[in-house]
Structure formats: structure tokens, C-alpha cells
Amino acid sequence: MDAPVLYAELNLAETRGLRCTSAPSLPQDACQGPGWHRVALKLGCAGLIFLLMVLSVLVGFLVQKPLIEKCSVAVQENRTEPTGRSATLECPRDWHPHCDKCLFTSQTSRPWADGLVDCNLKGATLLLIQDEEELRLLQNFSKGKGQQFYIGLKYEEVDKVWKWMNGSILNTNLLQITGKDEENSCALISQTEVFSDSCSSDNHWICQKTLKHV
């Protein structure tokens, strides 16, 4: 009677031994784990890059939105005549609407004085920048054109200051002029900065005039 019991115990021990020896086969699946981890990591990185791109676009839009709304308000105010009636505001042909202004960009490059004369002949003046928000919009405008332009700002050697064509002195809190402050220096606007150059240099220019009621 003792023999069968012994056999059963040995059989059970062998079965347990087999189960124990089969356990080392499990790490084969585990060895595949790092591959899946790498794939997941790559997908995660790609998703993060995409989210950052979307975020940058949204930030750019949110920055520009107040500026665009400000222009819309300015235009809407000018659309209302003294009588309270709505009026149509239009720019002349070949001029670009910008807030409450019309802008003209020259097709040729000439010295600053020639640009000033050209604007005067068109019943306009070289561009005047009123505030920092308008500066950013005009830099985007310049970026779209892919050029740099003379504006209505010139260095006055006698007074040692930069002056706009309307006689007002440049507010350095509004913008900083990159380059030299010296006689015969005129300001240009590009997509990134406002800088000085010799007034005798050939450059494009921007004229401005107010929107007209028609």
C-alpha cells in the first residue's frame, strides 16, 4: 500500500518540477518588450512635436487677433459719416488697405528723397508708425512683400534725434533704430527690425494716405 502513495508523490514532484523548469521560457516575450517600448516612444515623440506645432500656430493667431480686431474697430469708426450713415471706404488702385490707411509700395528702388517726392505727388506721405501694434502688423506686411522699405523717419543731425515727417520726435519706447545715428541716415522697415541706412542708398519705400469715403 505504501508503494502507490510513494509513486503518486514522486509523480506530483516531477509534475511540479516540470512546471518550475518551464518558467524560464517566459522571458522570451519579455525580450520583445523593449521593441514595443521604442515604437511607443517614437509615437509619443511624434505626437508631442505635432502638439507643439499646433500650439505655436495658435499662439501666433492669438497674438495677431487683437491687432486685427483693433484695425477692424478703426475701420468701422471711419465707416460712419458725421450724419451717422454707413460709408464705403476704399483705397485707390494699386494701394493696399491697412487699418485706417492705404499703403503704396514702390516697384523701383531709389534714394529716400525720391521716395518722399513720389509720395507727395500721390497726395500721400512716407509711412508713419503710430504704435507698437501697428509696427508688428507692418513688419508682417513687409514679410509678405519680402523686401525692406524706407519710411518717413530721418535722423536730424542738428537736434541729434530721429524725426518723423510730421515733425514729431521718435519715441524710443515705441521702436529702436538698429544701426548708426548720423547725418544723412534714414530709417527702413523690414520683417524683423527698423534700421538706419544712408539716405542716398537705393531702396523701395512705402507711402500712406487715409482711407477715403466714396
UniProtKB/Swiss-Prot annotation:
Transmembrane segments: 43-63
GO cellular component terms, A-Z: membrane
Domain of life: Eukaryota
S-S bridge residues: 119-207, 186-199
Subcellular location: Membrane
Entry keywords, A to Z: Disulfide bond, Lectin, Membrane, Signal-anchor, Transmembrane, Transmembrane helix
Extracellular topological domain residue ranges: 64-214
A molecular-function term among this protein's GO annotations: carbohydrate binding
Membrane-topology descriptor: Single-pass type II membrane protein
InterPro entries for the chain: C-type_lectin-like, C-type_lectin-like/link_sf, CTDL_fold, KLR_subfamily_B, NKR-like_CTLD
Domain spans labelled C-type lectin: 98-208
Cytoplasmic compartment residues: 1-42
Gene3D superfamilies: Mannose-Binding Protein A, subunit A
Name of the protein this chain belongs to: Killer cell lectin-like receptor subfamily B member 1
Organism in which the protein naturally occurs: Mus musculus (Mouse)
